[in-house]
């Protein structure tokens, strides 16, 4: 890992790195500063999310339209930021001796056991095994909603006519349910969650002007993790307590590993910790969702499956962008629209919603701007987490033991080594995706 990290830097690219940092900060500030007028009030992107899931068709569509209009008003700025980022990164790659940015991008992600050809094989398996299954999910959703298939973004966002699963209670109730879950899951998780809560190592309430997104990091001097997020009253709030805390738990388990650079494994390895923890929380879904627990479980599993094509498309789009840095913004949007037909045939790109209709939806995905090539890590990890889901259904105790085998080595092993150490099926190739499609179908 140190060798890979050393390959990513040269004094020659310092000006580009500085400009890259300025541009990604500009993007983050632009999204965080969003003031979206809706029904006489003003919302941030995060605060608008529950309204984009409203069971009322007209209100939900209007919320999506309001968000899309804000993005369209800032389209030129979003285009210019990304256009400059692509060209900057291409320059960095070439200065470091590469044909384009892609090899440098992989090195910056710390990829130590797989490359572009592995990702291309994974992509092909996703299209073959997961896209048809995800398509069935959305066809059934259209039938439930009484909508024509394919549906637009606003209708795809509503899983049930009665509304999507919502947490019961407010932030304090969700955090209390989280403590209960971790206390009952295992002695290790009980100790971990008490450290997090008792030392206020979470900042999760949404505020105007607060940066968007959610993440977990570590406070190295104190040997503890820290969670940042924005609660918004949706099931995403529970994901903070499961997903981000899954990252935090893994970091807590590896906090004393020396050298400190081995306390975190590579990115895709980390995402297995978080996505799998979401599935370990299933038996406690009633604590989080009350009467909506069954609805949540269905939505969670369906969402895990349908995410894989979307995330793979995000990665494919970035490969095209960096293989062809000369593309204009309009040509990039056309590529997104083309890929949508392959990976997301259930998504209708509506002309009445130009932000989505023109193929601009990728501009909502901050990783594309801030963390190139990160997104495939989510897809690989989701594949492994679905292996855990299948195990949890038959033997939760054995599943947890397998999870701890995967987690304990932290960054002392590569992703492929962690998979083998835990006795899991590698997500590369067709076997894992084929088996998941069979189990979930």
Segments and roles (model prediction):
Residues 1-164:
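A well-structured
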Residues 3, 241, 249, 276, ...:
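C-terminal, non-catalytic "cap/extension" segments appended to globular domains
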Residues 82-94, 98-99, 137-141, 246-256, ...:
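Long, well-ordered alpha-helical segments
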Residues 127-129, 254, 265-292, 300-302, ...:
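Post-HExxH zinc-binding segment in Zn-dependent metallohydrolases
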Residues 144, 161-222, 234-235:
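Auxiliary, metal-adjacent structural segments of Zn-dependent hydrolase domains
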Residues 144-177, 285, 301, 305-307, ...:
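Long, K/E/R/D-enriched contiguous segments that form extended
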Residues 197-214, 223-227, 345-369:
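Flexible, glycine/threonine-enriched loop-and-boundary segments that flank and lead into catalytic domains
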Residues 229-253, 271-274, 279, 317, ...:
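Active-site recognition of the HExxH zinc-binding catalytic motif
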